[in-house]
Curated annotation (Swiss-Prot):
Mn(2+) binds at D237, H345. This is Alpha-1,6-mannosyl-glycoprotein 2-beta-N-acetylglucosaminyltransferase. It is found in: Golgi apparatus membrane. Its main location: Golgi. The gene is GNT2.
Length: 430
């Protein structure tokens, strides 16, 4: 009886060990299967960084090449920017009259999800290419993009974002001047802005990212560098109505006849709090920063003002455009829009309000935007006239800027972005 009990005990112990071994093996297999594609991509990218470095030598000027070589993540992002769009198997053909959509994002995932959800309901979105431009690399933002299945989508990542440079420029360096008057004491690097304040990488990244994105989309990507038509620009806290894409197509088609002097077409009024007039008339007004679109000829006009853009002491790209670039065109810069908005700015937390810092803005991203039946169909008619708004309030020539953009290093990096796709590596910063 004792022997029988002993055999049973040994058999149970063996089964228990076998069960533990099976569980451990299964856990390892599941862990390997669940490794994010981005991690695998990173591994494959690292395998060929030397080849990428040689490739960059032929494409970047010496200044940008020096910055990129100092950061392994920067090199990896350069490589990722050449990846083909996703979902080409689901949407193999793009419409010839497409308006490419570019989505400028940072790290506000709670907003980004809302914007992506609204895009998924936009009629005609499957006919075009969506480009998501990231300010550096944030895994949660990357996962949201990888979940998109409603159109072709391409990701680009700013490889010069201060967020990926922890101890060197464009991030924070140990030798940076930090407080007012530090530069007078010597032994620190950096120029103050017009108010005596030194650069904040988190702040300057807003303008750097926008300018890098514009130059990359118009001049650097295979998918868009030959695109002559309009490109629509939106941000991670913009809610698009279902009729947004069809409306912007209509506006860009009508613009040459209805408003030949208009530089752009907008989905929303320049006053972000307005939902529009609701009148039966098109509107020509100052260009807004919600759902704005323009074509390559306008981009060329903007690009010619790179020095004005890069040397204006304001960290906001839009205020820089209103106060110095647009006035330099020599005529009022009007945009054409409908009488009812097709896009809404819903964010409460600004891009300059980060996480983990004093004064952070907390918002769970829950929005309640009413979408009416008229917001689901094209609500712009070709027979309408155009109401022109002149002498609107807002930033104009003569405004000297809010500062935050006084460091010569930022200004010259900005100028380098303007030449990175137009000159060889022998070109130096202007």
């Amino acid at each position: 009886m004792a022997n029988l009990w002993k055999k049973q005990r040994l058999r149970d112990t063996g089964l228990c060990r076998l069960g533990i071994l099976f569980a451990v093996t299964l856990s390892i297999v599941l862990m390997l299967v669940s490794v994010p594609r981005t991690a695998l991509n990173g591994s494959s990218i690292d395998d060929d960084l030397d080849g990428l470095d040689k490739d960059l030598e032929a494409k970047l000027n010496a200044s940008l090449l020096s910055v990129a070589r100092g950061n392994r993540m920067s090199l990896r992002l350069h490589r990722r920017n050449h990846f083909s769009p996703r979902n080409t198997d689901l949407f193999p053909d793009l419409a010839k009259d497409r308006v490419v959509i570019v989505l400028y994002v940072h790290n506000r995932a709670q907003y980004f999800r809302v914007t992506v959800e609204s895009l998924s309901k936009v009629k005609g979105i499957s006919e075009t290419l969506l480009i998501v431009s990231h300010d550096g690399y944030f895994e949660e933002m990357n996962r949201i993009v990888e979940s998109i299945k409603f159109c072709q989508v391409k990701q680009i990542f700013s490889p010069y974002s201060p967020h990926i440079y922890r101890t060197s420029f464009p991030g924070v360096t140990l030798n940076d001047c930090k407080n007012k008057g530090d530069e007078a004491k010597g032994h620190c690097e950096g120029n103050p802005d017009q108010y005596g304040n030194h650069r904040s990488p988190k702040i300057v990244s807003l303008k750097h990212h926008w300018w890098w994105m514009m130059n990359t989309v118009w001049d650097g990507l295979e998918e868009t560098k030959g695109h002559e038509g309009h490109i629509l620009f939106i941000e991670e806290d913009h809610f698009l109505f279902p009729n947004a894409y069809r409306n912007i197509q209509t506006l860009t088609r009508l613009k040459p006849a209805k408003c030949p002097d208009c530089f752009a077409a907008n989905l929303a009024p320049s006053d972000v709090k307005s939902r529009g007039e609701g009148l039966e008339s098109l509107v020509a007004e100052r260009m807004g920063n919600v759902g704005y679109s323009f074509n390559r000829s306008v981009w060329e006009n903007i690009h010619q003002k790179a020095r004005e853009f890069c040397f204006f002491d304001d960290y906001n790209w839009d205020i820089t455009m209103w106060a110095t670039v647009f006035p330099s065109f020599g005529s009022p810069v009007y945009t054409l829009r409908g009488p009812r908005t097709s896009a809404v700015h819903f964010g409460k937390c600004g891009l300059h309000q980060g996480r983990g810092d004093e004064g952070d803005c907390i918002d769970n991203g829950v929005v309640n935007i009413e979408v009416k039946e008229t917001d689901k169909v094209v609500n712009i008619k070709e027979g309408w006239g155009v109401r022109v708004y002149k002498h609107q309030a807002g930033y104009k020539a003569g405004f000297e800027g809010w500062g935050g953009w006084g460091d010569d290093r930022d200004r010259h990096l900005c100028l380098d972005f303007a030449t990175m796709y137009r000159y060889s590596s022998s070109s130096a910063s202007p």
